[in-house]
């Protein structure tokens, strides 16, 4: 198995067949809906909130609402669907979550997407929760994770998951690899490639995305959707506290298993950092789309599928030519 990560790989260009990159289509069918970009903000408290979820849905972008406001999930589903927007929520695997799924069915609420969101998703608990959701809400598109192996992908798909989320601790505010010795940090792109060999359904690449080019690389190696945390953090609309340090504005960004999210120092696998203020999300999404259109034009195609067919080289950390922040 080849081991590499995002900064180790360069994609090789093909002959361009478009007059302008604006001809390139970045949209993706994911579950019951089509979205403008194969990108989803991380379902973290410092990245996503209800107001942003509404904005993303209105503008044809995929989102996943985090699971840290358990009481607010049913009102959120009702509000989104009353507005004619899709509902995409997260659940855990504790006993009360089984009751929650049952309650949704009893109330006739059918969120279009449910993500089962735990750090180590290759587990009987996740498999049982997939079956619970599919039993009570058979039409809901179920995303399950996180996993880092082909065996994990295969087992969750076989249990009924419609998509899997791949990545164990490669994110900027995740310290799983340091705290536990396990994870896909440092070889996340190779893990996506490895898992894609077993996947029969869509995969979400989750974590380790540092540049827009990494989105194209994720798709090349098998992802249908790419989850982004730090690149979406610290915008004007982002949740999180704004602070001024040395005359510059920053926003806090912390991991979902950090003590800042948990409110206690127990089983901590996340940390907190401050990210420089970046302007508006709309501007970032526009730039992301334009960069991905350029990627497609370099791939010699007109849509995302062309990215899957390009060749690549492994260059071992040299793509920055020593010029790194």
UniProtKB/Swiss-Prot annotation:
Ranges in coiled-coil conformation: none
Function: Catalyzes the irreversible NADPH-dependent deamination of GMP to IMP. It functions in the conversion of nucleobase, nucleoside and nucleotide derivatives of G to A nucleotides, and in maintaining the intracellular balance of A and G nucleotides.
SMART domains recorded: IMPDH (SM01240)
Signal sequence interval, chain numbering: none
The protein's enzyme class: oxidoreductase
One cellular component (GO) term of this entry: cytosol
EC number(s) per entry: 1.7.1.7
SUPFAM superfamilies membership: Inosine monophosphate dehydrogenase (IMPDH)
Lineage of the organism: Bacteria, Bacillati, Bacillota, Bacilli, Bacillales
GO biological process, alphabetically ordered: purine nucleotide metabolic process
Binding site for NADP(+): 203-226
Keywords: NADP, Oxidoreductase
Catalytic activity: IMP + NH4(+) + NADP(+) = GMP + NADPH + 2 H(+)
Family the entry assigns: Belongs to the IMPDH/GMPR family. GuaC type 2 subfamily.
A GO molecular-function annotation: GMP reductase activity
Annotated active site: 174 (thioimidate intermediate)
Name of this chain's protein: GMP reductase
Gene name for this UniProt entry: guaC
């Amino acid at each position: 198995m080849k081991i590499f990560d995002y900064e180790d790989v360069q994609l090789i260009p093909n002959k361009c067949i478009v007059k302008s990159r604006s001809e390139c289509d970045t949209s993706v069918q994911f579950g019951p809906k089509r979205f403008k970009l194969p990108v989803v903000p991380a379902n973290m408290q410092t990245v996503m909130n209800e107001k942003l979820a509404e904005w993303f849905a209105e503008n044809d972008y995929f989102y996943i609402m985090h699971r840290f406001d358990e009481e607010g999930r049913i009102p959120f589903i009702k509000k989104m669907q009353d507005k004619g927007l899709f509902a995409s929520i997260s659940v855990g695997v504790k006993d009360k979550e089984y009751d929650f799924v049952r309650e949704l069915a009893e109330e006739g609420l059918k969120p279009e997407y449910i993500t089962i969101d735990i750090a180590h998703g290759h587990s009987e608990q996740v498999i049982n929760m997939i079956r619970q959701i599919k039993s009570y809400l058979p039409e809901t598109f179920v995303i399950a994770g996180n996993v880092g192996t082909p065996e994990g992908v295969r087992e969750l798909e076989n249990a009924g998951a419609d998509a899997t989320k791949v990545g164990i601790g490669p994110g900027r505010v995740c310290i799983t690899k340091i705290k536990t010795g396990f994870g896909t940090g440092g070889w996340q792109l190779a893990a996506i490639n490895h898992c894609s060999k077993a996947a029969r359904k869509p995969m979400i690449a989750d974590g380790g995305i540092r540049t827009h080019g990494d989105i194209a690389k994720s798709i090349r190696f098998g992802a249908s959707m790419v989850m982004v945390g730090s690149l979406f953090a610290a915008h004007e609309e982002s949740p999180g506290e704004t602070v001024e340090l040395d005359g510059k504005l920053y926003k806090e960004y912390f991991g979902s298993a950090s003590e800042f999210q948990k409110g206690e120092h127990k089983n901590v696998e996340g940390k907190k950092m401050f990210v420089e203020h970046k302007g508006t999300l709309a501007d970032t999404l526009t730039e992301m789309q334009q960069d991905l259109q350029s990627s497609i034009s370099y791939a010699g195609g007109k849509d995302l599928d062309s990215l899957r067919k390009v060749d690549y080289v492994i260059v071992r950390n040299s793509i920055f030519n020593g010029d790194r922040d």
